[in-house]
């Protein structure tokens, strides 16, 4: 038997306990990384508790033992029977981007709710312990000083996703937004919506990838810094129609065309008399265009007045090969097609300001469509823009590297230039597959 003395402070002890299913013994279930118990180094997972501050724990429930600990102040004395062989830690720290939201308070399966770590889509997590197949220990890099918390393992979340998926009634393939309620914390990050017409052409792509497999809840990431000899990263602008994405892209390229350039799109229509192949468009046959589509070499595509239009991976690479920064706008559901090792996109979400700000800044702005010319923004248009932005951020925010609120076009352009400079010059979190030798993206 061993006596362990801990001085309790304002922080949790950093350990969980459980009752052995057969013997009824109270055991240390796990030691939380960075907590008081781990720093003390005298209690290990598997140790049997005999006494706490002189009170025998035999026959007590774990909740009763926790109550004794909660009522204790200052020094806490444990009498324990050590595990026969203390675990040897050989954990490798891994960093991941969360692709889902997680709330421990809404998870009935978590072993200890108080030890749970809540996180949101896009958060970068440092996973410090994967020894448990179901519950990992992690901390947010924004709160690296605090002790770790419990998060569901990749295996557990995927299992929950599959169980949820198969428990739902069959619905026809509609490509409409998912009707999942907010309470379900294990969303798969693949809920989509109809984004409406783009000004150039309607997107004919099935927007939801609703026949695809369950998405990975975590994406392993590493720090990446572009070197001078490397190609520039593709800059992707995303935002609801009317927020100013096209205008920002146009102004960005116009302010420095030797640095920034758009990719030349492809089309199946015939060139007009004043057009030149490779300048306005790459003019190709429908067969060639569809071959690029089915080969996943089209980042975006759509059909307009019977003709196909789209931007290919090769067209983007042609700009990057010239040593320029390629800037393009994408619908959010197309971001994943661009997230490859060869393009390494930096995704910037252009977000509308408040309704009152939009009424002021866009009171003289016009909507130009195929049906109306110089149609002013109405409150319904602004409301739709705001709601669409919220949906984009909610469903695709894990892919956004930076967010700019376009309250003022001049300020937004300055922020855009600054964000691109940081993407080019500073360390950024990117998928591990983008930089690992021999990895496939």
Curated annotation (Swiss-Prot):
Gene Ontology molecular function terms on file: signaling receptor binding
* Residues covered by the PDZ domain: 1-84
Cellular component, GO, one term? plasma membrane
Q: Which Pfam families match?
A: Guanylate_kin, PDZ
Q: Which residues form the SH3 domain?
A: 91-161
Which GO biological-process labels does this protein carry? protein localization to synapse
Annotated Guanylate kinase-like domain ranges read 232-421
Main subcellular location: cytoplasm
- State the compartments where it is located: Cytoplasm
Tree of life domain = Eukaryota
Q: Which positions are tagged coiled coil?
A: 373-430
Q: Which UniProt keywords apply?
A: Coiled coil, Cytoplasm, SH3 domain
Q: How does it assemble?
A: Interacts with MPDZ. May interact with GRIA2. Forms a complex with CRB1 and PALS1. Interacts with FASLG.
* Family designation: Belongs to the MAGUK family.
What is the annotated role of this protein in its UniProt record? May play a role in retinal photoreceptors development.
What's the name of the protein?
Answer: MAGUK p55 subfamily member 4
Q: Which organism is it from?
A: Rattus norvegicus
Name the encoding gene, please: Mpp4
């Amino acid at each position: 038997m061993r006596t362990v003395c801990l001085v309790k402070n304002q922080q949790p002890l950093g350990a969980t306990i459980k009752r052995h299913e057969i013997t009824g013994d109270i055991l240390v279930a796990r030691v939380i990384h960075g907590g008081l118990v781990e720093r003390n180094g005298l209690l290990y997972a598997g140790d049997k508790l005999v006494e706490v501050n002189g009170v025998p724990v035999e026959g007590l429930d774990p909740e009763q033992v926790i109550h004794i600990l909660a009522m204790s102040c200052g020094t806490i004395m444990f009498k324990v029977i050590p595990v026969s062989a203390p675990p040897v830690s050989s954990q490798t720290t891994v960093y991941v981007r969360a692709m889902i939201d997680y709330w421990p308070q809404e998870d009935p399966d978590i072993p200890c709710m108080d030890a749970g770590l809540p996180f949101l889509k896009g958060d970068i997590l440092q996973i410090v312990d994967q020894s448990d197949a179901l519950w990992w220990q992690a901390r947010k890099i924004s709160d690296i000083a605090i002790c770790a918390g419990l998060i569901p393992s990749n295996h557990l979340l995927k299992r929950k996703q599959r169980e949820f998926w198969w428990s739902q009634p069959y619905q026809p393939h509609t490509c409409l937004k998912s009707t999942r309620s907010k309470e379900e914390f294990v969303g798969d990050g693949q809920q989509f919506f109809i984004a409406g017409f783009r000004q150039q052409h309607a997107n004919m792509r099935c927007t939801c990838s609703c026949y695809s497999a369950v998405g990975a809840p975590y994406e392993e990431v590493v720090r990446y810094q572009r070197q001078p000899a490397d190609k520039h990263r593709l800059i992707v602008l995303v935002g609801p129609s009317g927020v100013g994405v096209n205008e920002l892209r146009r102004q960005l390229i116009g302010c420095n065309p030797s640095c920034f350039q758009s990719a030349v799109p492809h089309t199946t229509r015939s060139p007009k008399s004043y057009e030149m192949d490779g300048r306005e468009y790459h003019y190709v046959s429908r067969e060639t265009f569809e071959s690029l589509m089915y080969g996943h070499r089209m980042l975006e595509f759509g059909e307009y007045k019977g003709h196909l239009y789209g931007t290919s991976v090769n067209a983007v690479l042609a700009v990057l090969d010239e040593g320029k920064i390629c800037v393009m706008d994408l619908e959010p559901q197309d971001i994943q097609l661009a997230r490859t090792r060869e393009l390494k996109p930096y995704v910037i979400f252009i977000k509308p300001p408040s309704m009152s700000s939009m009424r002021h800044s866009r009171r003289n702005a016009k909507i130009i469509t195929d049906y109306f010319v110089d149609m002013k923004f109405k409150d319904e248009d602004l409301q739709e823009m705001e709601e669409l932005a919220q949906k984009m951020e909610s469903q695709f925010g894990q892919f956004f590297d930076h967010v700019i609120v376009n309250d003022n076009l001049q300020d937004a352009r300055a922020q855009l230039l600054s964000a691109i400079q940081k993407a080019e010059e500073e360390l950024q979190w990117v998928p591990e597959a983008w930089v690992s030798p021999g990895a496939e993206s």
